[in-house]
Structure formats: C-alpha cells, structure tokens
C-alpha cells in the first residue's frame, strides 16, 4: 500500500449520501486524481492518504484511497489555501489572505486559542470571529474523531455517523460501553461493537456484552420472521453466540425486562417493539371492527343490498356466485373485512364489485399492495390506481434521520388517510411493522378490506399477519374456494389447488400450460433452461426473454439463484464493448442486467420520468423484492441507474450495490406478490425443510400462462407430500383474542 500527501485542489464529484469522492490532489505541484470514500472532506484540506494507483479504462491513472487522515497545514501558503477554500463558511480567498498576512505562522493558534483577535482583521466582526473559530473547532473535532476510530478498523463513513450521534461523548461511549453503538448507530451491529469491545479489553462475560448479545439474538430471530423466541431458545442461542453459559444470560434477560427493552409473556420473550406492534395492531383492529352506520342488519335492508348488487352485477356483465355476493355484503356492513382464497377463485372479480359499489356511493377508495409489482397488477385488474403501501402512507426520510432501515410516514394517527374505503391486496406479504403503520393511518369509520391467499409463503419481515387474523376468528371473513370456469381451464390453477390439498398432480405433459421436463443432470438442466428462455417460451407466451422468470427454492448450490444468475447473465446479457459494467464482490453488474433490491432502504430517492426525460413523479424508498433493469453505469459519478418495473428510476452509488442482486433467477420467497408470463422451476431435490408443499404452491402460482419444471418428478411428488414448514413464533392471534375478550387459546401458535 502506498502513501501520498497533498492538499485538495478541488472536488470533481462527491456523493452526499455515502461520501464517494473524485478529487484532484496537489502533490508538490503535481495533480493526482484520487477516488475513494472521503465523506466530509472539502476543498483546501491537507491529507495523507493510503491506497494504490490503478489504471481506469476511461479516465486513466488514479489513486484509489483506502484510508486517509487530514493534517493541519503548518506553512502560510497551506493555511491561506485552506481558509480560502470554502471549507470555512464566510471566508473567501481575499479574507483568508488578510488573516494569514496579519497573524502569519500563528494563524491557526490564534483561531483556536484567541479567536477574538480575528476582529483585528478588516472585514471581521466579533460575531464573525466567533463563527470562524466554532467552525474550525468542529472540523478539528471531527478530524480527531476519525483518526481515533480508524484504529478500530471503522470506515470513515461509519465514523462520521458515530461522531454525529454522540459528539464529544463518543470517547466515553467507546471506552465504557461500545455496545451502545449497536443500538444507536445505523450500520453498526453487534458484531462490529463486539470487535471494538474485544480490542479495548472488555471481558466476554461483561454485563454490557451479554445484554447486547441478547438483543442481537432477538434481532436475528426477527430477521427469520419471528416476533418472539421461547425463553429456552433465547438462552440457548444467546449462549452459543456469546460463548458463555445460560446461567450468565438469564439474569440479564430479567434486567432487560426491568429496563423495558424486553417483554415476557409466559415463556415467550419479545424485543419490546415487536410485542407492542402486535398489541397495538390488535387494539386498532378491534376499534376498526364496527358495524357501519347504514347497516343495522335488518332483514329488509339485507334484501335491499342483495337486490342492488344483483342489478349492478347484471349491468356490469359480472357473474358472482353466492359466496362472492356474501363477501361484497360483508364489506358493506362492516368496518373490517377479510377476503381470502386461492388462484382462480374470483377474488379479483369480488374486489371489482366491491369497488364499483362504493364508487356508486360516492366514496373515496384507496387501493394498495405491499410491492410495486403487486400494486401494478392490482391497477391492471381493477382499472383503479393502486399504490404500494409505503407510497400510500407517504414515506418521509426526514423523519427517519440517517437510518435507512427505519420507515417513518407522513400518514399516521395525527394525519390519517382521507379515505372512506381502503383495500389492501396480497396481505400474506405484509409484516407486523408495516401493518402497524397502516392501521395507525386509518380512522375508525373507514372501511378496511384485507385480501390475500393465506397458503402463500409468509412475509419476509416478522409476523404472519394474515394467518393470525384468520386464525383468531375475531373478524368478518369470507374464504372463496370455487374455481371458476375460465380459471378451471388452466392446469396451473387446477394443479395449485390440488397441491394445496395434498393431492398428486398429472405430470404427463398433456397440459397446455404446465410441463415437467424430466432431467437429472445439472448441466443438461442449464442447457434446456437457456433454450427455453432465449427461444421457446418467449414465442409460446408472447413475451421477451427478460419476462421469463426462473424461481428456485435455494440461494446456494448448483441450482441455487447465485449460480444460475452467473450462467444466465452470460447468455442473456453477455459482455459487450458497448455495455459498461462494474464489479461488486463476486458479481459483475452490466448495463441491461435484470436486478433485484434485496433489502428495504427507506432513504433511496427515486423518480419517474415522462417524455423527453422530464420527471413527473418522485419519492423515497426502494424495497426488498423490487425488480428492474440496469439502464446506465456512470463511472464519473460512480453511480448505477436502475429502472424498476413500475417505472421508478434510482441512482445507486457504487458503495451501495450490496443492496442489489442479479435476478435472472430468484428464490421463490422473493417472488411473492409477483406474476410472470412464464416461470421455470429447477427442482432436483434439496433440504426437506425447504422443499415443501407451501413452497411449491407459491412457486407455481407466480405463473400467468406457463409453468415448466426442470428436474425430477419424484422431487415434485415429495414436495406435495411434505408439509413440514419453518415455524414462526408470533402472538398477534393471542393479542387479538385478549383485546376482543374471546376465549383464550392454550398456547401461543407457532405457524409457518
């Protein structure tokens, strides 16, 4: 690693979010182009940087900075250059020259120790002298903080966050309890805090360490979809993580309960936010579940509603069976209503009838779904605009601070949605935190209609909201089961219902939309997959190769999405001199690639452009599972532009590309809420807990026109027979029963 020293002549580009900087450094009269993460660095500053020279294919020789530290200039030229660079607000080149001429080599000492003397310089008042001194002190403090934190291997980007969080208190936090960082600073988790603690000599059985480890263990469980852990599991997992005994952990669990960071209900231990999320949801649901004013359940009124619905259906040429009509009636009579059912059972027709009824009443109707793809499908199916739930609630990054993990919304109890009816589709995808935010924005008296298929995989985030709502039996609900004539002609729909009931399906390839190609050799599967995507399926379903989606149960392995994406990229979007690309870890992103966002980021800005590239809409937030194409890679600004399927464009800094993955192949779990013209499922076998009925059902119901299974019929049959599922620890059902005074269940449910 080489070291260079010089001053920043000027900044070519600096990303305000992550600090990625392109700058010109002057070294003894020589200009050197430098690139790296240098957040907070400004023009005129003197630095010593470590890194290496690289040869950029377009911009030539550059110095790639790995670490740097700012150094205070000691000569008059350096002092004048720094003060006049714009680093100090209100001081230009002329004023900087007068200051240095007045105080000479003593300039910086005067500013730090006798700032009032700056008023001796023409053009500087006593107030301005103090402002200059304060700015110099702040920059000095930040420089010293960065140097201090670098010794613990903390990047400059994280170091700036830590300093901004604590200020001068940072040093005492680092010495006494670095585990506070894991709770207070976005980007610093338990692992980083634990490494710092080890370096400064904090013992492995420290109370601070054990408390932080317990919270981290529960956070990991939340990442697996749980809202709590049984005490014994928490003790076991915590002991394994921390390398201590369960006896060391138990007292700290009690202390965290006293501190209200944990909540214990019987043997269930919750991180406090998730206990209160479920409890708050239960209370708000109870408040919404009221008979509507126009309904007193009089027989004559029920008959009038039925006749009106029948007339409307006839006028709209809509065919509804008895259960669908009952569903519409329940949505009219109740403040809260749940509509469930599998594919082809008429949920969309029922939703359309509900919308038309309330539209005829002059009511304001809002439609939403968890993802952009699901919202787009809802719009196409109903003819009414549907938004993502995040857009409906008006995500606001200013309320979230610097933490990209947290969502805060403009719409809440103080500023509720101005709607008479809110309809949410794909409820199986909604986690407990998003559901809580939604309910906070809905006033009692507003109708809330929740729609979904409970047999789909549960949400990626914590909870199993739809299943718990239905299991509680506390709210009006209709489950549609009949497969309608048009849907009944689709073997995708018929087979989905058979699979869901545990019935074996025909795999004889006599279908027009459901095929199995029996293959046992992985390389042969690769070959056929490429042929299907490049040629056969696009012609068969009238789509492009990029519309065909490979869905796999696994991330790893020869048929996992990581391996498949590398193979499919080579054939579907090969390297080309006309296409820019950028390496990130083991992946290469190329213009034209199909990509997916793999975590929620509530800070990312997006815009939608119309004709002539004129922005017509903008907002915040890109979410786990959003898919799109790479439109541009810009090496100058170190950004990559993705256009998502719903038209949003997002500029990603190169440093933020760990949030993106190639998506020619994705896991079935990530496909929730999406629909594709054709789906390919490579199924040769794998872990029993993964290769189950629920996963197969979800995978095939993602296809609109064609399902092709590449692999083993035996694997398919085993999956249909396999009802083992990953259990989720949730208690929303229990909380609902408590607040609604329903009979208690004997134990908390553990459902998939």
Where are these regions (language model features)?
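Accessory, non-ATPase domains that flank or precede helicase/AAA+ motor cores in DNA-metabolism machines
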Residues: 1-297, 752
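A generic structural signal for residues embedded in beta-strands
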Residues: 11, 49, 597, 630-633, ...
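Loop/turn positions that initiate beta-strands
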Residues: 44-46, 592, 625
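Pre-Walker A segment
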Residues: 264-342
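ASCE P-loop NTPase helicase motor core
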Residues: 325-329, 333-510
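Conserved helicase motor core of P-loop NTPases
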Residues: 454-620, 739, 747
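C-terminal accessory regions
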Residues: 617, 624-752
């Amino acid at each position: 690693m080489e070291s260079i020293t010089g001053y920043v002549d000027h900044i070519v580009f600096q990303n305000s979010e992550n600090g990625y900087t392109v700058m010109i450094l002057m070294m003894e009269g020589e200009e050197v182009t430098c690139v790296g993460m240098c957040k907070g660095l400004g023009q005129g500053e003197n630095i010593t940087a470590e890194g290496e020279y690289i040869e950029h294919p377009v911009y030539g020789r550059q110095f790639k900075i790995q670490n740097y530290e700012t150094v205070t200039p000691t000569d008059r030229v350096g002092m004048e250059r720094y003060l006049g660079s714009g680093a100090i607000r209100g001081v230009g080149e002329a004023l900087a020259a007068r200051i240095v001429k007045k105080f000479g080599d003593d300039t910086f000492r005067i500013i730090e120790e006798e700032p009032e003397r700056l008023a001796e310089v023409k053009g500087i008042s006593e107030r301005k002298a103090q402002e200059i001194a304060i700015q110099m002190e702040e920059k000095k403090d930040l420089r010293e903080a960065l140097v201090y934190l670098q010794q613990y291997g903390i990047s400059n980007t994280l170091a700036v966050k830590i300093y901004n969080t604590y200020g001068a208190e940072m040093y005492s936090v680092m010495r006494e309890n670095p585990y506070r960082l894991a709770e207070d600073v976005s980007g610093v988790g338990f692992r980083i805090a634990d490494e710092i603690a080890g370096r400064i000599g904090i013992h492995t059985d420290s109370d601070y360490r054990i408390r932080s480890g317990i919270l981290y263990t529960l956070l990991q469980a939340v990442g697996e979809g749980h809202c709590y852990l049984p005490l014994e599991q928490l003790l076991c997992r915590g002991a394994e993580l921390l390398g201590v005994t369960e006896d060391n952990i138990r007292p700290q669990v009690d202390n965290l309960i006293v501190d209200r960071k944990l909540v214990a209900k019987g043997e269930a231990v919750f991180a406090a936010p998730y206990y209160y999320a479920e409890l708050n949801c239960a209370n708000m649901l109870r408040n919404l579940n009221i008979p509507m004013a126009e309904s007193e359940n009089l027989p004559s009124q029920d008959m009038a509603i039925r006749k009106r619905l029948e007339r409307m259906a006839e006028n709209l040429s809509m065919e509804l069976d008895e259960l669908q009509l009952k569903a519409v009636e329940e949505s009219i009579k109740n403040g809260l209503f749940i509509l469930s059912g599998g594919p082809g059972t008429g949920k969309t027709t029922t939703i359309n009838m509900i919308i038309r009824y309330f539209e005829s009443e002059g009511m304001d109707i809002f439609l939403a779904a968890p993802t952009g793809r699901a919202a787009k499908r809802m719009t196409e199916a109903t003819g009414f605009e549907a938004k993502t739930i995040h857009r409906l609630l008006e995500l606001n990054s200013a309320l979230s601070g610097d933490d990209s993990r947290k969502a805060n919304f403009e719409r809440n109890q103080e500023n509720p949605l101005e709607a008479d009816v809110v309809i949410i589709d794909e409820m199986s995808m909604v986690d407990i935190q998003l559901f809580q935010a939604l309910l906070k924005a809905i006033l009692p008296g507003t109708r809330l209609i929740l729609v979904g298929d409970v047999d789909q995989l549960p949400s990626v985030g914590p909870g199993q909201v739809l299943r718990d709502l239905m299991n509680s039996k506390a709210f009006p609900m209709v489950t549609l089961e009949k497969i309608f004539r048009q849907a009944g002609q689709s073997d995708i729909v018929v087979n989905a219902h058979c699979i869901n009931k545990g019935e074996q399906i025909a795999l004889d390839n006599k279908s027009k939309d459901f095929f199995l190609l029996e293959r046992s050799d992985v390389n042969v599967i690769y070959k056929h997959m490429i042929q299907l995507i490049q040629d056969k399926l696009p012609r068969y379903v009238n789509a492009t190769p990029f519309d065909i989606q490979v869905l796999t149960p696994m991330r790893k392995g020869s048929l996992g999405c990581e391996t498949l994406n590398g193979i499919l990229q080579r054939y579907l979007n090969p390297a080309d001199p006309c296409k820019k690309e950028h390496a990130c870890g083991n992946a290469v992103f190329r213009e034209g690639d199909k990509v997916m966002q793999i975590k929620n980021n509530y800070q990312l800005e997006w815009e939608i452009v119309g004709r002539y590239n004129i922005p017509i809409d903008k907002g915040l937030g890109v979410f786990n599972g959003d898919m799109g194409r790479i439109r541009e890679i810009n090496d100058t600004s170190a950004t990559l532009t993705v256009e998502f399927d719903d038209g949003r464009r997002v500029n990603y800094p190169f440093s933020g590309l760990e949030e993106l993955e190639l998506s020619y192949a994705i896991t079935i779990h990530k496909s929730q809420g999406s629909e594709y013209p054709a789906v390919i499922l490579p199924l040769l076998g794998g872990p029993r807990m993964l290769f189950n009925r629920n996963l197969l059902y979800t995978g095939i119901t993602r296809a609109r026109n064609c399902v092709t299974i590449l692999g083993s019929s035996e694997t398919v049959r085993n999956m249909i027979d396999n009802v083992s599922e990953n259990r989720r620890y949730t208690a929303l059902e229990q909380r609902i029963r408590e607040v609604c005074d329903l009979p208690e269940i004997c134990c908390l449910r553990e459902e998939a």
